[in-house]
Amino acid sequence: MKKKRILALFLAAVSCLSLAVSASAAGTTTRKATDFKDYDRTAWYAEAVSAAVDNGLLYGKSSTTLDPNGDMTRAEMAAIINRSFGCYKVADISQYKDVSKSKWYYKDVALAVQMGTYNGRSNSSMAPDAPISRQEAMTVVARALELDYDSYSKTDLSAFSDRSEISNWALPYVRAMVGADYIHGRGKVLAPLDNITRAEFAQIFYNIIGTYVVSKGTYDKDIKGSILIRTDEVTLQLSLIHISEPTRL
């Protein structure tokens, strides 16, 4: 059995905010997954998508649709990462000629570049509207979580028949995500070059986050799993945090 570990996603850590305050609370949405007509309560993704939407991480494509089986774009993923970690510092992204200041995602891309989770497709292109591949998604999340790539360098990927398709630049991040039990692939394949769907990305977050804290106050009850704080003025009794194995993707 892999060693259980604590991962505190206090919107906090990872070079975005101090541990005392979360700035992302203002962006939290009150929409529920069940508000969208294409959300399927019986689908494999139901719990993961519900958690992502209900806690303000995943937004709809329109007022009535979520498009859970649609491809996630690079800009959409940047926005979710920023909402999760409450980032506020922006980078100069003027070098990326395909990121217009008039687009909704301009600030999200600037935040993601400053955080170090995003690089361009080239020195002058970010391709924000392009779908993001599964190996790119694993890379972004691994960077955001600051996983120790060296400690996962010997992660065994032999169970996946398509492991040779993983790009060399992505391999350390894929090993880390698999080694941390956050990714388990599509059966016997990782499909690293396939586009990741919105539901699949929601599932990754569901595998990572065990507890959402959405109300101010002191939490002195047992807390299971990793923590994502979605408000400010929260006090945690850390001795009461317990770790459980994540749901498999």
What does each model-found stretch correspond to?
Residues 2-46, 54, 59-107, 114-138, ...:
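Feature responds to low-complexity, polar/acidic, surface-exposed segments characteristic
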Residues 225, 229-231, 238:
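Residues on the solvent-exposed faces and adjacent turns
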Residues 231-232, 248:
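Glycine- and small/acidic-residue-enriched microsegments that form turns, hinges, and capping elements
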Residues 239-242, 246-249:
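Residue-level detector of conserved catalytic or cofactor/ligand-binding positions
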